[in-house]
Amino acid sequence: MKRIVIVCEGPTEQEFCNNVLLPEFIRHGITIEAPAIKHSHGGIVPWGTLRKQLVNHLYESDVHVSMLIDYYGIKDDYKFPGWQESKTIQDKQERMHFLFDRMREDLPAQLQNRFLPYIQLHEFEGLLFSDIDVLQHNFMPYEIDIKELQEAADKYPNPEFINDHPNTAPSKRLGRAICGYDKVLYGNLLAMDIGLEKIREKCPLFNEWIIAMLTTKR
């Protein structure tokens, strides 16, 4: 069975990998391990720290390595390869592809073919906007402002583009619209209910990542 290590930003991403991705990947003969980023205390770390962990995993035998972190949380001083230059690229998907290429190129040449770089545009919670009906059906009318969430979903070409201000990031929208919203618990229950197929259908960059992992060669 093929093995993929996905280094995760935090518990939300780990639960998503274990509860949503893993069952599907096992059907394709692939097992997933989802360790958290080391030395982060929750959240993203500078590229140098993350790179060291990625390289250490890549030196394990017979494994591909990826990552699941939010674009929204990366700071300028984290010095991700190509970060400043990427800001000149207006198309967000092209910007992500540019960053993916720069990250891969920054690893030792002999490891690059087993590295599957990924950054979630703009953050994990954007994936939950893939099916607003699921959000509505999981809460009582007095617990959720479905109008705000539907307007956000309708405003953008796809859920990955939802983010025009720190106060209107997907997680902030969900926190305002859903009473008592818990990122780790609700995030993954909702993702499981929406289903991987629907998320892939609505989120093209995410779907590219899934395809890349499912089609890895030993």
What are these regions (language model features)?
Residues P46-L50:
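Short, glycine/acidic-rich beta->alpha junctions
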Residues P35-V45:
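Short beta->alpha junction loops
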Residues M1-V5:
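Extreme N-terminal starter segment of soluble prokaryotic enzymes
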Residues Q14-I37, R51-R218:
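C-terminal accessory helical subdomains adjacent to catalytic cores in phosphodiester-
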Residues I6-E15:
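Catalytic nucleophile-elbow at a beta strand-turn-alpha helix junction centered on a G-D-S/GDSL motif
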